């Protein structure tokens, strides 16, 4: 049987730590004769949270809520910090399973992360990696502090996290590209562009005689504003036949955010996007 742990996302909870401890237990008897497969996907930056020494899961939860819910910080800016306050991320998971042979897989399209399978781009991906926890990353403690300052979040960051970033040493830094390469590990993307929902939507639209256009696969904005812009394009197509002639299906994809502030809310980014778009079109 394969066990399952059900942690929270995007704000991590104690179940995240529980799941990581189970992974840690698996590594205790690893030898060089073992072959270890890991599979990670979207959301693992939160789901696979295992706080570094002197940082609690409650502090990381409060920090995550402040960054993503209150301030609307994109995951690409949050993840470098996550890797520096965690026991598994930033390649540390690969260290854990040394000296086994490692095969890392991700349920994402590597090309969408700017990682086509060429050697030079592969090294660039490792150097600037922010989305694949088992892999190395060239992001530093100084980068993390700069991100927090950019978002005016330093003063609201828990002291334990501040201290780790300020006192970071080479011994506690993320795994370097050179160290990761020395492991001889392999990395594969399991889901490619043609296996996503877009081809299916395009095919269904064609059955109804409708043209289908992807406005953006990399949308990163406030969900409400993204909905307003896409709805305005739909209205323009209907009323002026620009930039497309109606009838047409307009699609967009990416990772939008909803900045909630200190208040609480119900729903998510897709509801926010759709509500804003629907009210504009109506």
What is each model feature region?
Residues 1-32, 81:
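Glycine-rich oxoanion-binding loops at beta->alpha junctions
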Residues 54-72, 133-151, 263-282:
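Gly/Ser/Thr-rich active-site loops/lids in small-molecule metabolic enzymes
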Residues 48-53, 80, 87-94, 115-129, ...:
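Short acidic, glycine/serine/threonine-rich loops at helix termini
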Residues 37-42, 103-110, 130, 251-254:
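Short beta-strand segments
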Residues 1, 235-282:
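C-terminal non-catalytic interaction/assembly regions of soluble proteins
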